[in-house]
Regions:
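Flexible, glycine-/basic-rich loop-and-beta segments that form/coincide
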Residues: 128-203
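S-adenosyl-L-methionine-dependent nucleic acid methyltransferase catalytic domains
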Residues: 1-138, 184-353
Length: 353
């Protein structure tokens, strides 16, 4: 199996390099409005943002920032296939402007924007990303009533483009081989994820401190899960806010195609420096999934409840008929650089089979 991966150093408010209905899934984490680390970016996109902040017009700044994101949402409506899924990882912001502290509900604003463009909202996910700082509590400490709840979660908002789900040809191998294990379904499709911790995506050792400071990447597990949940082999995943390339890395490990857009070429250079590690990552991710499944089966067996079906490609039982054709892939080779990559995948090699 071969997949292709492209990264454009371009502004994602204009995705004219992509044709209509050319991607099946969007997985992205945009810059969060009213988070201070993104003020400079939003100001470059629209100087009115800085003017509003300097004037203490927090609501005006909030709306101006979201107006820039909405130009991207307009493009997503065009390039995403009917029935395709968009997964938007976004967090709310807390901030004091002109001496007044409040929360800025980014998730609600994004939800409104997508629904107004004809997307159907689907059940979303909260993922908890606890911080361990001793000073994480805001306000008056232990004195009521002026202390504030600390935000330790982000949202994965899920939307379908239009009212109908995607169609597949009956018995499509690319869909059945992309199945997930029954116990993965139960964990992944829970509305609260407590087993994924927030962290900065590791960059290469020679990346500059400035590049690290500007990295707001979500953990690899977030896009990897979403890609497995909402796409099949042969699909293309788009990330219009590419950053350090976590979505592309996850798409490669999941054996899907991908497209990314990024304003800063330095992130692409850092991705090229670490591309040699992706083959080993894909192998370890696949083997970990299979080993977790085998441990799950063993626990079921000890409880006297052995799953009733056999996997076709692995020496293990599975719970449902739909899992029988499941086939994991690993990377055998990667060619290319500077935003154009061709990846060869082969069935996961597991010595214990």
């Amino acid at each position: 199996m071969e997949t292709t991966h492209r990264v454009f150093v371009e502004d994602s408010r204009d995705l004219s390099t992509l044709e209509d209905d050319s991607v099946e899934l969007v997985v992205t984490s945009p810059p969060y409005p009213m988070i201070e680390m993104w003020d400079d970016l939003f100001t470059r996109l629209d100087p009115a943002v800085e003017d509003a902040l300097e004037a203490g017009d927090d609501r005006g700044a909030f709306e101006a920032m979201h107006a820039q994101l909405e130009l991207v949402w307009d493009e997503l409506e065009r390039v995403l296939v009917p029935g395709g899924i968009a997964c938007i990882n976004v967090g709310d912001a807390t901030r004091s402007v002109d001496g007044s502290f409040r929360v800025y509900p980014n998730h609600a604003r994004v939800l409104e924007a997508f629904e107004s463009r004809g997307f159907d909202p689907l059940p979303d996910v909260l993922w908890r990303k606890p911080t361990n700082s001793a000073a994480k509590f805001m306000g008056s400490g232990t004195l009521p009533p002026n202390a504030y709840v600390t935000l330790e979660h982000e949202y994965v908002l899920v939307f379908r483009n239009g009212g109908e789900s995607r169609d597949f040809e009956p018995g499509a191998d690319r869909r059945y081989e992309a199945a997930y294990f029954w116990e993965e379904r139960n964990r992944w499709f829970s509305d609260v994820w407590t087993d994924v911790r927030g962290e900065l995506q590791d960059l290469t050792e020679d990346a500059t401190d400035d590049l690290r400071d500007r990295s707001g990447a979500y953990p690899f597990e977030i896009p990897y899960r979403l890609i497995c949940m909402y796409s099949a082999y042969g699909d293309t995943v788009l990330d219009p806010f590419w950053g350090t390339g976590t979505t592309t890395r996850a798409a490669i490990c999941a054996a899907r195609n991908s497209v990314g857009y990024e304003l800063e070429e330095a992130f692409l250079e850092a991705f090229d420096d670490g591309i040699g590690e992706i083959a080993a990552l894909s192998r370890s991710v696949g083997r970990a999934r299979l080993e977790r499944h085998r441990s799950f089966v063993e626990r079921r067996r000890e409880a006297g409840d052995v799953p009733g079906y056999d996997a076709e490609h692995y020496d293990t039982p599975v719970v449902t008929k739909m899992e029988r054709s499941l086939r994991l892939r690993e990377v055998s080779s990667i060619e290319g650089e500077s935003g154009r990559y061709r990846v060869e995948h082969e069935p996961l090699s597991v010595s214990s089979d």
